[in-house]
Amino acid sequence: VIDDCWSLHERDKNGRLVADPEKFPHGMRYVADYIHKKGLKFGMYSCAGVVTCAGYPASYEHEFTDAATFAEWGVDFLKYDYCFHSTGTPGHLLYKRMGIALANCGRDILFSACSWGADDTRVWIKETGANSWRSTGDIFDCWASVKDIIQYQLKYMEYNGMGCFNDIDMLVVGMNGDGHVGQGGCTYDEYFTHFAFWCMFSSPLMLGNDIRKIDDKTLKLVTNKDLIRIDQDKKYCQPFFIGHKMEKNIERSIKNDVYYCNYPDGVVLLAKFLDDGKIAIGEFNLSDGETRWNNTFLTESVGVPESSGKKLLLKNVVTGKQILSANGCVTMENVGPHCSAVYIAEVVDA
């Protein structure tokens, strides 16, 4: 995806966007053709405002013209930002404008709404024709940013689903502090937590690192078949809280506009039903201390009470280690600070 700053500062005499000839001397169609020959999709950027976030021409009042231009250039994906938008036109109408323009441009272009969750995006975004919607501000390549976004997402579990996915933002996995969003980078364990959480939420997975420099460890992580399976599961069920106390396992409280679950020490336990009857289980330690007793959950919290005569058999998606429930409980492995573990559980006879 080519983000902001790709165009000239003025449109041409016909009101069309013009690619900067110094940055793209052969034009955007040439770039698209090159990318398509590599077997990849080509994404571009525009904005619902009067100018983009960096002050370049945006698509407000030019939606149909710009959609036609993107189609002519062979664009497959449009990131549509929200900077400097008209205060006289509500957000849902701004995104409907581009949504209907793309629907009539003659090319199948995935519409990625990037309104950062502002103006109650979650309430109206499915009306606009958008295929995905950004629910937070921009991510940065540091643990503090990843953790903040994870905690904030607990507010939006009900609003994800097929047709209009909650886009938690691009992946910073493997950036290692490089790039304009680099703020020191993360450890491998923090990157694992980041990637695993995105997969539990079925977020679009878009690598933000330079794939020409990707290291073996990062490549192994982002191609983990079980994690990808969880992210791409055909049901796209939303995750839900699980825990060791049924009366508290689904409670949420709001603090500074961020939802926190009731687990002590910042440990979050999530489950997600999969298409084949199995269950993804995620154990996320957002704290600075090691998990202890709070890594246990009742099988009843995923709909399998002990009275059913069934047990859960969990398999760690990285190590392959198996854990069998006992007495209606599952005790998972302890995970260290900022670490996580993900399992796929199947229901078996007791």
Spell out what each predicted region is:
Residues 1-87:
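Aromatic-lined carbohydrate-binding/catalytic grooves of carbohydrate-active enzymes
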Residues 2-5, 45-50, 80-85, 111-118, ...:
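Active-site-proximal beta-strand/loop segments in catalytic clefts of secreted hydrolases
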Residues 35, 70, 111, 200, ...:
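Conserved, mostly hydrophobic/aromatic
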Residues 62-65, 93, 103-210:
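Glycan-recognition surfaces
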Residues 193-260:
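Catalytic cores of secreted or luminal carbohydrate-active enzymes
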Residues 198-201, 206-208, 259-304:
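Carbohydrate-binding surface patches
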Residues 299-320:
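Solvent-exposed beta-hairpin/edge-strand motifs
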Residues 325-350:
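C-terminal beta-strand-rich structural cap/linker in extracellular carbohydrate-active enzymes
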